[in-house]
Amino acid sequence: MSWMQNLKNYQHLRDPSEYMSQVYGDPLAYLQETTKFVTEREYYEDFGYGECFNSTESEVQCELITGEFDPKLLPYDKRLAWHFKEFCYKTSAHGIPMIGEAPNVYYRAVWVVLFLGCMIMLYLNAQSVLDKYNRNEKIVDIQLKFDTAPFPAITLCNLNPYKASLATSVDLVKRTLSAFDGAMGKAGGNKDHEEEREVVTEPPTTPAPTTKPARRRGKRDLSGAFFEPGFARCLCGSQGSSEQEDKDEEKEEELLETTTKKVFNINDADEEWDGMEEYDNEHYENYDVEATTGMNMMEECQSERTKFDEPTGFDDRCICAFDRSTHDAWPCFLNGTWETTECDTCNEHAFCTKDNKTAKGHRSPCICAPSRFCVAYNGKTPPIEIWTYLQGGTPTEDPNFLEAMGFQGMTDEVAIVTKAKENIMFAMATLSMQDRERLSTTKRELVHKCSFNGKACDIEADFLTHIDPAFGSCFTFNHNRTVNLTSIRAGPMYGLRMLVYVNASDYMPTTEATGVRLTIHDKEDFPFPDTFGYSAPTGYVSSFGLRLRKMSRLPAPYGDCVPDGKTSDYIYSNYEYSVEGCYRSCFQQLVLKECRCGDPRFPVPENARHCDAADPIARKCLDARMNDLGGLHGSFRCRCQQPCRQSIYSVTYSPAKWPSLSLQIQLGSCNGTAVECNKHYKENGAMVEVFYEQLNFEMLTESEAYGFVNLLADFGGQLGLWCGISFLTCCEFVFLFLETAYMSAEHNYSLYKKKKAEKAKKIASGSF
C-alpha cells in the first residue's frame, strides 16, 4: 500500500521535517496562491494517515507510537476535533472517557444519558447549596466570662432642672409659668383668682404697749402664687385701722394660719407651725415696744384699698409682695425699710428664707421686709408699679404666645404639667449653655459625698458637667475614656456611693417629684436620662445592681448593624452611634427640613437654630412632625439599626429608708443638730449606690452559620458524588478552554495575515 511505503520512508530520512514535507507537503503552502490545499480525501485516502488509527497491525501501531506528530500541521477544524478527542481520553472526570471510547452508538448513548442525569442531579443539589449560602444565616454564641467587667459611666441629674429662684428671672420662663398657672387654675375649677381678700384691721386709735399693729387676715389659694416686689400706695399706722378687725379676730386667725402655711410651704403642721407662730409673736412684740407714735417706720401697712392709686409721697409709698395672677399685694412696708440681701433658700413661689441652718449651697439674691418676709429679687429691673399694672385691667398675654404654649382646651392637670415641662425646655433653649448651667444646680450642690471602691472621689475632677434639655445640669462619673475603672469586688461597698442633696425648697412648680435621675451607660454613649434613666427618691437608699452583657453583631450581608460608630447625620457629636440617637437625629433632620428650625429638645447641627418657644406656627409644625413619625408609616421614614458592638446593662433596683434614726452624725455641711440634719436630709437628700452584683459578664457573639469554606466543601462533595470531578478536574476544563481559545485566535490571525498579503499583492500588481 502506498501509505505504508510512505511511512517506511521515514526510516530512510535523517531529517523528520523533510519526511513530513514529503508526506503532507509544505505546511505553509496554503499561504501561496499557486499551492493547492490538501483535501480531506487526500488526507485520509491518498496519504492514508487516517487509516493508521484503525489499523490493528502491530507494526503500524508501533510506528504510530514512536513517530513524532505535530497537530499544528492539521487544518483548523481537524485540529479542534483532534484536540477534543484527546481531552476525552485524558480527562479525569468520570463518564466523559466512557463516552469518547464507546465502541458503538448504543454504548455511547447509555453513557450520555447517565452523564446528563448526573449533571441534572448536580445542578439541583448545587442550587440548594448556593441558596443556603446566600441566606447568610448566623448563629449566636453565648459565653460567660469570669473576668473583671469595666465600670460604666454614671450620669446623675436633679429631677428639678433649674432653680426656681433663678429661672424666674428669665422673662420667657416667667411668662411660661404665668400661662401654666392660669391653665392649672382653669383646670382645677379655681374661681378665686379675681376675688379680693377680706381685709380687717384692728383700730388702735391710741397705741398702747399691749396693742399690736394691723395684721393681715384673709383667705387665698396659693397653689400657683408667685411673688415679686412692687411699688404701691399704702396706709400705715392709724391710717389703716378698722373697727371690724376686732369683731372677726377669732375667725380670721384660722384663715391666717391656713394661708401662712401655704405661703411658707410648711409640711409638718405640728412642729413648723409652732415655729411660725413664734416668728409672728416675736415680730409683733417688737411692735409693742416701738409703736409709740401714730406711724412707725417698721410696721406693716395696708394697700388692698389703695393699690390702684399712685403714691403721693414718701409717707404712703410702699414695697409690697405682688402676685400678678391674683393681684394680691401683701405684705407691704415702707420703701426704705426693705433690705436687699441674699437668702439661703427660695421656693417656687419666690418666697425666701434667711438663716436656714440646714440649707447648703448657692445663696439667692432677695429683698426682705422688717418682718423677715423675703422675696426673690435680683435687682436687675426695678420693681413693678402696681397701680400702673392694675389700671390696665386684667392682664392679657399675647394671643400668639398663649397659642404657642398649647394649654387651650386642656382640663387634665397631669397633661398640663407635661406640656409646661416642654414649654420650659423651649424657653431655656433660647439661652446659652453657660446661662443654663448658671440657672441649674452645680455639682457641689448636688453631690455632697462620693466614694468608689471604698475610696473618696474627687468631685470636681471625677464628674463632668453635661447640660440636658429636660434635666438641666447633669454630672457624669467615669467620663474619662482613657481611664478604665473596674470594681475590685462585687457589692455596694465596692461600687459608686453618693450622698446627694436636691434642695426641694427651690424646685420649679412644674417639678412633680423630689429626687435624682440616674443613667447607666457606656462612656462613648450619650446618656439620654429622659429615656433610659432611673429615678431615685429622697429619703431612701437607692441601690442599683448591675449585670453586663456585651453584644457583637455581624454587619452586612449577615446583618444590618452600623459598624462605623455613627452615621453622617448623627447630631450627637463626640458620642458613638445608638438607636435612640439615630431616631432623634432623624426626627431633627426632618424638622429642620420642613420647619426651618430645630426641636429644642435635641441638638441642632452647625448653622441651624432652635424653634422659638413663642412662635405658634413653629410649634404646630413640630407637633405635626411628631405625629408623622408616631403614625402608621413613621417607621419607614426613620430606619435605625442596632450598633455592631453594644454594652447592655441590666439593672436591679432596691430601696431602703434613709437616714436611720441611729445615724446621729453631721451629714454634708448641715449646721443644725444631728436630729435636725437627719430630718432635713430625709426631705432633701438621698443615698445612691451603683455596683456589680457579680464579677462576670455575658458575651453574645454573632458568627456566620454557613461560610464560604462550608460552601466549597458541600459543592465539592456534590461534584465528586455525581460527576467524579475534583478541583484538578476543573482545572483541566479551564485549560481546555484556554487552549481552544488560543487556537481560534491563532487561526484568525493567520487568516488576517493572508488577507493582508493578498491585498498588498493586488496593490503591487496594479501599480505595474
Curated annotation (Swiss-Prot):
Function statement: Subunit of an amiloride-sensitive cation channel (degenerin channel complex) permeable for sodium, potassium, lithium and N-methylglucamine, and required for mechanosensory transduction (touch sensitivity). Negatively regulates the turning step of male mating behavior.
Organism of this sequence: Caenorhabditis elegans
Record-level GO BP terms: detection of mechanical stimulus involved in sensory perception of touch; mechanosensory behavior; negative regulation of turning behavior involved in mating; positive regulation of detection of mechanical stimulus involved in sensory perception of touch; positive regulation of mechanosensory behavior; potassium ion transport; response to mechanical stimulus; sodium ion transmembrane transport
Residue intervals passing through the bilayer: 110-130, 719-739
Signal sequence residues: none
A Pfam short name: Mec-4_10_cyt
Glycosylated residues, chain numbering: 335, 356, 480, 484, 503, 671
Phenotype upon changing residue 713 to G/S/C: No degeneration
Subunit structure: Component of a non-voltage-gated amiloride-sensitive cation channel complex (also called the degenerin channel complex) composed of at least the mec-2, mec-4, mec-6 and mec-10 subunits; the complex mediates mechanotransduction in touch cells. Interacts with mec-2, mec-6 and mec-10.
First-listed, main subcellular location of the protein, grouped into a coarse class: membrane
Designated gene of the protein: mec-4
Additional free-text comment from the UniProt record: Mutations in mec-4 results in the degeneration of a small set of neurons which typically swell to several times their normal diameter before they disappear, presumably due to lysis.
Listed Basic and acidic residues bias regions: 189-200
Compartmental location: Membrane; Cell projection, Axon
Keywords, sorted A to Z: Cell projection, Glycoprotein, Ion channel, Ion transport, Membrane, Neurodegeneration, Potassium, Potassium transport, Sodium, Sodium channel, Sodium transport, Transmembrane, Transmembrane helix, Transport
Stretches for region Disordered: 184-219
Keyword Methyltransferase: no
PROSITE patterns per record: ASC
Gene3D superfamilies: Acid-sensing ion channels like domains, YojJ-like
Name listed for the protein in its UniProt record: Degenerin mec-4
Tissue occurrence: Expressed in AVM, ALM, PVM and PLM touch neurons.
Membrane topology, from the record: Multi-pass membrane protein
A cellular component term, taken from the record's GO annotations: neuron projection membrane
Family named by the database record: Belongs to the amiloride-sensitive sodium channel (TC 1.A.6) family.
Top-level taxonomy: Eukaryota, Metazoa, Ecdysozoa, Nematoda, Chromadorea
PANTHER family reported in the protein's UniProt record: AMILORIDE-SENSITIVE SODIUM CHANNEL-RELATED, DEGENERIN MEC-4
